[in-house]
Amino acid sequence: MAKTQSDNCLPVTVLSGFLGAGKTTPLNHVLNNREGMKVAVIVNDMSEVNIDAELVKQDGALSRTDEKVVEMSNGCICCTLRDDLLKEVRRLAEDKRFDYLVIESTGIAEPLPVATTFDFRDEDGQSLSDVARLDTMVTVVDAVNLLKDYSSQDFLRDRAKTAGDGDDRALVDLLVEQIEFADVVVLNKAGTATREQLDLARRIIAALNSEARIIEADYGRVPPGAVLDTGLSDFERAQTHPLWFKELNGFMDHMPETEEYGIRSFVYRARRPFAPMAFNAFVNKPWPGVIRAKGFFWLATRPNFVGELAQAGALVRTSKRGLCWSAVPRERWPDSAEWRASMEPYFDNTFGDRRQEIVFIGLADQMDEAAIRAELDAALTGMVDRFTPDAWKHLLDPFPNWEQQAA
């Protein structure tokens, strides 16, 4: 598993997972079974004292002089410590003493910003990708508590776990980010979970990321080859991992994996606007069996705007996505034949690019597609063949004022 001569870049595994999932135990297990590899570790903890780094050191996994733990405390590597991360990874890569680097991020870090650090090129034209190669994104989840946490309406501040003032993220949003962007998901504490907890945990992971390899583990005992030097990470491909993205963009190769876990999905599409009150009622009612929903919507009272819907677990959010291209003067459109060709399928002679397009992903035995479609159809308004925004102005609209929000 050591680097070949043709691979001059230091391979890197990024280890993520919410606090309490047990990230440090698989890290220590891998380090104690690394088959002669010289491994450097960067450990990031949000506390003043880097507890995870101390656990790694006390375990004795890196006791040799040719290996090293780099501590990065009191900050999150996806934000405040990005510059420090760049410097440390570059220094370790240029040192040429290590076969591999493992970055254990804080439990409240999202993996995507960490991954983008490797493609970031500074003002001097230097990039981590010149000396290091992002090899595997690993997320560790707690098999016992995943369903409870995924169904929670808690914010990180409710758990006293934030990246600082202004961190208003919900717990489920962080879990979704960590799972959707992973190449490998370690389902830790599998032996402690009930059969039902384990089954639902697998199904949640498959519903969020049909590409991820799921590895069940106890006490973090993960084969090193499952998380080191896998060659799985591909930044552009990783952005298509989420199952909702595949559905909205017509990817069909995910079906066998999702069927194996009893997951099904569908896309609701329509070319008429929603009546705001009716759509708001739908948004605020339970959706049995739905694990994830994401997409775009059009309200009759807001003919120039695209709305975005995002649901995960018990939380549903709606927000302004931006202006419809139909509402933007053509002289401001991108001057690209490729862009125009890509947008052509979305344009209609009557409504332009205004449309409803929402993907629903859920448990095959619980999600009622027909009922969801019927409720959304009932929320539509307007004539099928006519764009009449003036006729819809009188409709009551309970959604926040998008005109006052920054674009």
Give the predicted meaning of each segment.
Residues A53, R82, L112-A115, R195-D199, ...:
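Conserved strand-to-helix beginnings and helix N-cap segments that scaffold or border functional pockets
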Residues A2-T4, E48, L146, S152-Q356, ...:
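C-terminal accessory "lid"/substrate-recognition subdomains
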Residues E54-D59, R202-I205, I372-L376:
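Short, aromatic/basic amphipathic alpha-helical patches
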